[in-house]
Every structure is written in C-alpha cells, then in structure tokens.
Swiss-Prot record:
Transmembrane segment boundaries: 7-27, 40-60, 85-105, 106-126
Quaternary structure annotation from Swiss-Prot or TrEMBL: Associates with subunits I, II and III to form cytochrome c oxidase.
Family, similarity comment: Belongs to the cytochrome c oxidase bacterial subunit CtaF family.
Record organism: Corynebacterium diphtheriae (strain ATCC 700971 / NCTC 13129 / Biotype gravis)
Protein name listed in UniProt: Cytochrome c oxidase polypeptide 4
GO molecular function annotations of the record: cytochrome-c oxidase activity
Domain of life (superkingdom): Bacteria
Amino acid sequence: MKATSKIMYSMATFLAIMAIIYLFATMHVEDSGYMVGYEWAGGVCMILGTLLTVMLGGYLHFTENRIDVLPEDWEEAEVADAAGTLGFFSPSSIWPLAMSGAIAVLGFGIVYMHYWLIAIGAVLLIYTTTMLNLQYGIPKEKH
C-alpha cells in the first residue's frame, strides 16, 4: 500500500503540473473561430483528475497506516506470501467462448443501432453467464 499511495501522489503531482500548463496554454491561444480565454471543459477535467488521484492516494495512505505490513511492502517476502487461493479452474468449459460471442452480438447491435440485435445479444449474454455460473451445479444428465 505504501508504494501504491506514492504512485497516486506522483500521478496527482503530474496531473497538477499538466493542469497548470493547460491553463496557461489555453489562455494564450487565440483562434478567430473560437472564444478567447481559458478552455473550461479540459481544464475542469484536469483539475478533477488531480483531485481524484489525491483522494485515492490519501485513502491508500490512511489505510496503510491502520493495517499490518503487506507482503509487497516487506523486503524479505516471497511470491508465495502474497499468493492466495486460486480456486477451481475449468479447462474444458465452452461458456467463456459462448459469452464472447454473445458480447460480440451485443456490441454489433450497439454499433449499428439494431435494437433487435441488442435484444438478442442481451438475452444470449444473460443465458451464457447463467450457464457459466451453473455449469457444475446442474446434474451431468442435464448438460
């Protein structure tokens, strides 16, 4: 967590510097087809991005002070110290491929604004997600 909060603080510093540069750059650019002065949309986004990274860095910093030393902060830690339980892996499941196809159908429906294709893709995605979650909860004769 200590390294993560330092990364967030350094990102916030970078974004603050870029926001200041953006402020001065947009104030001195004059375009006859556009209004002269500070460009608000980009400037507000830069400032809000800075504030959000400061907020996240502060949260990580305060959380790090209240917990024990994590394996990534301990210099003598092994890789196995941070490794958790991976759980069960199904190497022969067809449902991730089917979900990819359903997402592709849904994506094509959204791209081309075909509502019938969006509906079919959504139904397929719900069905394939359900089957992925229930593939070992259904008896073998129902597969």
